[in-house]
């Protein structure tokens, strides 16, 4: 008996995998025929997060002590699509005093992103952080963020849970399959359904409003 859970959020497409654990925000009832596996629906959410043993209580958002509204995404650079960059660039244009913090260690991707943001005229508003030395340094960076932006169509999971644990709100956009609905499921089950956008225009609107 083989059951698929975290790590590969889709059908394996082969007969040797028997079950896939999901929830009804990720795989709709009328989509079960698209999966080789039988779907095990968990009540509420398919994911679990035990929390972090780190100080997370602070009284105000960074923008309350600054003229700058700070957006952030610590998702793996491989999840940042060109479409995502275009939407983020539009947001940076619409919010006058704003900046976007990105963090990873993939130099090649950073070069590509810089070229893309430069083309959109917002590179000066994007801050690239190197990979953190340790987990505590990584998680404390959330204290510098007013609002986290989820990637699409491949949404975040760990980074979304981390942000919410650190009391930082997250905007996500629901998509067309398991991978692109993870952010939606986490937010809905955190009683934050208003932070889920149905399309790019709504995503932008929710951030800039």
Where are these regions (language model features)?
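Catalytic binding pocket for nucleotide-activated donors in carbohydrate/polymer assembly enzymes
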Residues: 151-209
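Proline-centered loop/turn at the N-terminus of a beta-strand
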Residues: 1, 99, 167-169
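Conserved catalytic-core segment of nucleotide-activated headgroup transferases in glycan assembly
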Residues: 44-137, 141-143
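Active-site-proximal region of nucleotide-activated glycan assembly enzymes
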Residues: 1-57, 61
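Acidic donor-binding loop of glycosyltransferase active sites
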Residues: 141-154
